[in-house]
Curated annotation (Swiss-Prot):
One of its GO terms (cellular component) is cell-cell junction. Residues 263-277, 285-305 have a biased composition (Low complexity). This is Protein SCAR. InterPro entries: SCAR/WAVE_fam (IPR028288), WH2_dom (IPR003124). GO terms for biological process: actin cytoskeleton organization; actin filament organization; ameboidal-type cell migration; bleb assembly; cell-substrate adhesion; chemotaxis to cAMP; cortical actin cytoskeleton organization; exocytosis. Residues 382-399 form the WH2 domain. Disruption phenotype: Amoeba grow as very small cells in suspension culture. They have reduced levels of F-actin staining during vegetative growth, and abnormal cell morphology and actin distribution during chemotaxis.
């Protein structure tokens, strides 16, 4: 259907003269008069249409002029503030400008509504609407309708488009809610599968270390972070000396006394009968120590080695005599002779110390409430034991080679870069060998 915006009626639309019962001259005069009236009517309609057109143009021009004036009023203060803004940006660093608080700009966009109203209906549409026939009288059927609906609504519904728009918006809203519900269910399902499948287990970590003094292998097993302390397992190596065993199992037998003071005497006094003092034997209730274990706890600088005295409940035991420093071959033989363990009856108490040297302090005794197992022996270095054993001329047991498990070598993937690097290395080796052969020929 074509909507005519501006309609110009024909000359004969509004002028239908009655020509019946008139003569020829009267008919001609009547037609000329009606035609002139029709032309004048058309000119009138043209003037009305032109007036409406130019009025609309004037209104539009007026609106544009108002917008331009409003925009000009907003631009004038900006033009005045441009020089000051340029000076500020020229004299201020970017960091200073970024550190200051800034305001967010929001454009004031007013929303317009009520675009389609009765007042905004064009005249051509009103003309067509006025020409339409009125609806039939269907109110008589309303008592027979269900749910109290109007029967005229089935014939014509002015709210049809509004109802359709509301139904479409509700449908879109339901679809959006359904998609959101599906995404949430898929996310929860994926999270549940992840919790069921991916169960991370804590791997036990094993740390292997070696004691720098004794060469003992120490294995630390760390099973989980919840344990209070890691389990430490000591695995003795073949290179450990026998004195380490004595040091662990002989702590509850006796305790080594502090080193005796060394008196500096003349060479004539070094070979006196007092220096040939034989130390008392170890206690009988202890196990017989090995020859190598009797040299522990002695510094390498002393020429005469004294075994530790036995622990006794008698507090009146005299302290051991002081030893003198000597360096002869006879003293070395004497120390070798005295180093052998003696298992015999208890010997008489030792003679008093010589008057030339002060008496050493008495050895520490065990407390009344504690036993001998609470006292720990003095730690001795493996180097001093080895040096003293060499000085005594004892046969040392050859240490076995300590084997450490090597990690399996992983096969490296060959690529083009590795092959080229190997070729360059081989080429360099061949060139150097050729240069050496040439030099040997010239020689």
């Amino acid at each position: 259907m074509v909507l005519i915006t501006r309609y110009l009626p024909s000359v004969t639309d509004n002028n239908q003269p009655a020509l019946e019962g008139q003569s020829k001259d009267q008919i001609v005069d009547t037609v000329i008069t009606s035609t002139t009236v029709g032309i004048i009517n058309q000119l009138t309609m043209l003037v009305a249409h032109s007036n409406s057109i130019f009025t609309a143009l004037a209104n539009d021009a007026n609106l544009v002029t108002q917008r331009i004036e409003k925009l000009g009023s907003r631009i004038r203060p900006l033009i005045q503030s441009i020089p000051s803004i340029e000076d500020y940006h020229r004299n201020t660093s970017i960091d200073t400008m970024n550190s200051k608080p800034r305001a967010e700009f929001h454009a004031d966009n007013s929303e317009r509504n009520q675009h389609f109203t009765h007042a905004s209906i064009p005249a051509s549409i009103n003309t067509v609407y006025e020409k339409c026939k009125p609806p039939p009288n269907l109110q008589l059927l309303d008592p027979y309708m269900d749910d109290g609906q109007k029967s005229l609504k089935l014939y014509t519904n002015p709210d049809f488009f509004m109802d359709e728009w509301v139904a479409e918006q509700q449908k879109l809203h339901e679809e959006a809610r359904q998609r959101k519900r599906e995404r949430r269910e898929a996310r929860l399902k994926k999270k549940g599968e992840k919790n069921e499948v991916e169960v991370k287990k804590v791997k036990s970590v094993t740390k292997v270390r070696y004691d720098p003094v004794t060469g003992e292998k120490i294995t630390i097993n760390i099973e989980s972070p919840h344990t209070s302390s890691p389990q430490i397992q000591h695995q003795s190596n073949n290179t450990a000396t026998p004195q380490h065993t004595t040091q662990h199992f002989g702590t509850n037998q006796y305790q080594a006394p502090p080193p005796p003071p060394l008196s500096q005497s003349s060479p004539s006094q070094q070979h006196s009968p007092i220096n040939s003092y034989t130390p008392p034997p170890p206690p009988l209730n202890t196990s017989t120590p090995s020859p190598s274990s009797s040299f522990q706890g002695r510094p390498p600088s002393t020429g005469f080695n004294t075994p530790p005295p036995p622990m006794s409940n008698n507090n009146n035991m005299p302290p051991p005599p002081p030893m003198q420093q000597n360096g002869g071959a006879a003293n070395n033989r004497l120390s070798v002779h005295n180093s052998a363990p003696i298992v015999a009856a208890p010997a008489p108490p030792p003679p008093p110390p010589p008057p030339s040297a002060p008496a050493p302090p008495p050895p520490p005794m065990a407390k009344a409430g504690g036993g001998a197992s609470d006292i720990k022996p003095k730690a001795s270095g493996a180097r001093s034991d080895l040096l003293s054993s060499i000085m005594q001329g004892m046969a040392l047991k050859p240490a076995e080679e300590r084997k450490v498990a090597e990690a399996p070598k992983k096969e490296e993937a060959l690529n083009v870069a590795d092959i080229l690097a190997r070729r360059i290395a081989w080429a360099g080796d061949s060139d150097s060998s050729e240069d050496e052969s040439d030099d040997s020929d010239w020689d």
